[in-house]
């Protein structure tokens, strides 16, 4: 377009790295942010939704920042962890590391339904059917492989891309519908205002 030029900027690694570390019990051993950071133009801050993993269960947590380097983890009082809601968890630990892994969160200014102002897309593996036997430590290799084959056949369409909605980015409702079966466990979510369509990649 006349009058515009493209210029590639070279990112500089922040000396403060890592800017987010798992320093709370509910965050486990690692934090993963994927693409879940946005700038809230109305509030003038950055918001992050990240996954705490490595403790046999997953938690989705929330943090805010003014500069993208120093992040605050507010006590939200939403989810109980070890008997206390003094934490920044917005989605409870379930014991299943693949409950929902957030790919990305968007704040949709055009949404008419206030309860769906924030939208999250992510990977989710729904629980296995009750007739699939549990894997036990005493299973031999043949029995374990047989169980996993049954499990894979039964959950073929029970995992993939799912969505969640929120009025404020803190209180979430997860839709159990698998929107894109067998989608991968990492991706992104954006909104194209020109085409008025959502785009998810996996």
What function would you assign to each model-found segment?
Residues 1-202:
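Carbohydrate-active catalytic/glycan-binding domains of CAZyme proteins
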